[in-house]
Swiss-Prot record:
One GO CC term on file: cytosolic small ribosomal subunit
Gene from which this protein is expressed: rpsR
Pfam families named in the record: Ribosomal_S18
Highest taxon listed in the record's lineage: Bacteria
Gene3D superfamilies cross-referenced by the UniProt entry: Ribosomal protein S18
Lineage: Bacteria, Pseudomonadati, Spirochaetota, Spirochaetia, Leptospirales
GO MF term set: small ribosomal subunit rRNA binding; structural constituent of ribosome
Name used for this protein in its record: Small ribosomal subunit protein bS18
Length: 94
């Protein structure tokens, strides 16, 4: 019970067991909601925009990482799939 006397695994300042603080993360903002011009430019032919949301292996980056809202993530995925089907974006990179 020696840990309880010293504050236990959780320190008095909110540190966790391994010294990490319970910090609040900065909320990600949807780039398409913030910039309407970018949303208007979202098209399967605009490979420069679509490449930002695809990994180097050809996978679509999930919205929890990019910060896009659900509405725009679905639209983005639709345009990426269109671009892949006509050959502007690769399905996978070897």
């Amino acid at each position: 019970m020696e840990d309880d006397e010293k504050g236990g695994f959780r320190g008095k300042d909110g540190e966790g067991k391994f010294g990490r603080k319970n910090a609040k993360y900065k909320k990600k903002v949807c780039k398409f909601c913030a910039d309407k011009a970018l949303l208007a430019g979202l098209d399967y032919k605009r490979v420069d925009i679509l490449e930002r949301f695809v990994t180097n292996r050809g996978k679509i980056i999930p919205r929890r990482i990019t910060g896009t809202c659900g509405k725009h993530q679905r639209a983005l995925a639709r345009e990426i799939r269109k671009s892949r089907s006509i050959g502007l974006l690769p399905f996978k990179v070897l």
